[in-house]
């Protein structure tokens, strides 16, 4: 445990941010998984709908600093390629 007052505060802040980031990342993984399941099933309409929602979540996570902007772009590109293969 830290003895310095500012470090005690940082520990609290970091823990809150860690939990928030964990929640966002979990939501992202779920969205990507549901998109991939729809794409694998060949359901193009549902996959298109999920692609828009997943892209939005990726952009929001990147803007909040949860994931890097390049990682969001790479994932969006991979999802777009997957939908084009259907």
From Swiss-Prot:
One of its GO terms (biological process) is translation. Pfam families: Ribosomal_S20p (PF01649). One of its GO terms (molecular function) is small ribosomal subunit rRNA binding. The keyword Ribosomal protein applies. It comes from the Bacteria. The keyword RNA-binding applies. Keywords: Ribonucleoprotein, Ribosomal protein, RNA-binding, rRNA-binding. One of its GO terms (cellular component) is cytosol. Belongs to the bacterial ribosomal protein bS20 family. Binds directly to 16S ribosomal RNA. PANTHER family: 30S RIBOSOMAL PROTEIN S20 (PTHR33398), SMALL RIBOSOMAL SUBUNIT PROTEIN BS20C (PTHR33398:SF1). This is Small ribosomal subunit protein bS20. The lineage of its organism: Bacteria, Bacillati, Actinomycetota, Actinomycetes, Mycobacteriales.
């Amino acid at each position: 445990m830290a003895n310095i007052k500012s470090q005690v505060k940082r520990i609290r802040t970091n823990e809150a941010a860690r939990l928030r980031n964990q929640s966002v990342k979990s939501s992202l993984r779920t969205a990507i998984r549901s998109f991939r399941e729809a794409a694998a099933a060949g359901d193009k309409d549902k996959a298109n709908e999920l692609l828009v929602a997943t892209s939005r979540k990726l952009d929001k996570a990147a803007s909040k600093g949860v994931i890097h902007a390049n990682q969001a772009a790479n994932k969006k590109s991979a999802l777009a390629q997957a939908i084009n293969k259907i």
